[in-house]
UniProtKB/Swiss-Prot annotation:
The gene is secG. It is a single-pass membrane protein. Keywords: Cell membrane, Membrane, Protein transport, Translocation, Transmembrane, Transmembrane helix, Transport. Involved in protein export. The function of the beta subunit is unknown, but it may be involved in stabilization of the trimeric complex. Pfam families: Sec61_beta (PF03911). It comes from Thermoplasma acidophilum (strain ATCC 25905 / DSM 1728 / JCM 9062 / NBRC 15155 / AMRC-C165). This is Preprotein translocase subunit SecG. The chain crosses the membrane at residues 32-51. Component of the protein translocase complex. Heterotrimer consisting of alpha (SecY), beta (SecG) and gamma (SecE) subunits. Can form oligomers of the heterotrimer.
Amino acid sequence: MASDRKSEGFQSGAGLIRYFEEEEIKGPALDPKLVVYMGIAVAIIVEIAKIFWPP
């Protein structure tokens, strides 16, 4: 009985692995560092705009 349970888990897990390996990435591949740097740059631009933009 114990060996039957182990084999069922492996088969179901193998299907998930196969599904995720075949998944296609649609969109640009960006480096995570680039995203962080862009966020920091936007934050700096917003803060500078708040200082120099007349209310």
